[in-house]
Amino acid sequence: MVEQVCAKLKRECYRVNITRQTDEDDLLGGFRLINGQTVWQDGPVVTAMKQGGVLLLDEIDLGSANLMCLQPVLEGKGVFLKKIGQWVTPAAGFTVFATANTKGKGSDDGRFVGTGVMNEAMLDRFPVTLEQPYPTKATEKKILVKAGCDDADFATHLTAWSEIIRKSFYEGAVDEIVSTRRLVDIVNAWQIFGDKSKAIAMCLARFDDDTKEAFLSLY
């Protein structure tokens, strides 16, 4: 959503995909060997600060304690690049967003393997938390049409089907869910193979047999 809003507003967006290995060098910058010379290169965080851009820390709950180097940045202050002795002050418009499937609390059920409980001090530096629900059926249908689904009935059926599955998931009746991304995958598979049932079955194949059969029967 952040990238789409930035595109709409014509704002520069710097996306960083966070992993357990992401460290200060990846984020703030470091020395790189270029044409035989050791040259300092700003990282995406510093670049976004200087340009007054939007910084998107994607899947931040996959990171480690190395992310604590971002504390002053999240406070809205500048950051000191100790390797080159330079202080960087954020330009006007600089904004930080982060996405996290677990809201920084980790995953006890194993659905988001690799995530961990984030440092509470870092979480406290994000003043606003927004939960992004799935789109309405009308909006989701538009997404599928834009993805290339030229069969209105198929798009309507897919969105109604996914809504039933999501309701069942939230009520605890099923353990899996069909996301908007997976619906788009179904549309793409249908465009390739020309068979709706095959496309749905292929995109549900990642689930266990019982879940797959239950979802297919719902359709």
Language model region names:
Residues 1-219:
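C-terminal regulatory/interaction module of P-loop NTP-utilizing enzymes
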